[in-house]
Structures are given as C-alpha cells and as structure tokens.
C-alpha cells in the first residue's frame, strides 16, 4: 500500500504543492515502509527513517541490551513481527536491510541509544553509505524508541526531534 500510494502521489505531484521533490519518511514500522518504498519507487528525493525496523531476522546487541524496560521491548517486537506478515517470513519487504541500496535517495537515519532497533538502524545507514548513498545518521544518547513523540514531556527528546528535523531540512535544501 505504501508503494502504491507513493507512486500515485508521485504521478500527481503538481496537485500537492507544485515541486518535483517527493521524500518518504516514517518511524519504527513506518520506517520499514519508507525504506521499502525507497527501494521500490525510483527517483525519490530523500528518505527520513526514524528508529526503523529494517531487519526482522537479524541478531544485534541492542536487541539483547535493550530487550526489556525501555518502552519497546523484544517480546512486543516478536508479537509485531509474527502478526505483520506471518505467511511471508522471508519476504525482503520485512527486512529492507537485505535489499538493494544502489541508486537510493539520500537519507537521514535517526536511532536511539536505548532502543532494541538501534543497531539495525545503524546497519542500514552504514549499508547506504557503503553503496555510495549520502546519509546522515544520528544516534541520540539517552533516548528510547518513540522519542519523537515525547517532545512535550522531555526537553532532551524535543532537542533530539528538532535536531533530526533540522538534518532533514538541510538535506532537502541541498536538493532544491
């Protein structure tokens, strides 16, 4: 659905504001959808991936280190993964880290220190960089999964959110 919606919007971009730049972005599972969309829809301007889930089968230290007690836990992640697409456990769309990276749009990837998804997000940023894709990766110390929605209750979360948005704004400014 994300790919189809993006292709439709891209085909009618002038109706939505008149520029020819279209970026995708999302957090957590939305980061997964955005990464898959960037791999599937050519000529996107940018991708903004916020603590994305990009490798459902990987084994990462952050999944052990942050498995419990930091808002998103691995028990909940297992439930999400088992219910997201149980008939397609090896589908590349579940793990875009195992997909292609050549020719992808530049990216801003945000991760959080105390997030089970931290290391896969960092690995995705590294894979983009290794493929020659321009990428800014920010790992926010002291932050947990979901910090982008915590700006009203945490000064540190607000600062991290504002920094991430500023990085995206800088990236988009270079494309105009």
What is the predicted function of each stretch?
Residues 1-176:
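Alpha/beta-hydrolase superfamily serine-hydrolase fold, recognizing
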């Amino acid at each position: 659905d994300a790919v189809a919606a993006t292709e439709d919007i891209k085909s009618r971009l002038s109706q939505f504001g008149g520029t020819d730049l279209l970026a995708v972005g999302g957090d957590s599972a939305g980061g997964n959808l955005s990464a898959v969309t960037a791999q599937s829809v050519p000529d996107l301007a940018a991708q903004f991936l916020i603590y994305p889930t990009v490798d459902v089968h990987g084994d990462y230290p952050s999944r052990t280190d942050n498995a419990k007690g930091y808002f998103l836990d691995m028990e909940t992640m297992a439930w999400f993964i088992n219910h997201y697409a149980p008939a397609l456990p090896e589908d590349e769309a579940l793990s875009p880290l195992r997909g292609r990276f050549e020719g992808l749009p530049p990216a801003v990837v945000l991760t959080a220190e105390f997030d089970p998804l931290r290391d896969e997000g960092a690995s995705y940023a590294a894979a983009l960089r290794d493929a020659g894709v321009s990428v800014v990766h920010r790992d926010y110390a002291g932050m947990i999964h979901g910090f982008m929605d915590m700006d009203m209750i945490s000064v540190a979360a607000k600062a991290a959110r504002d920094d991430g948005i500023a990085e995206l704004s800088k990236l988009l400014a270079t494309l105009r």
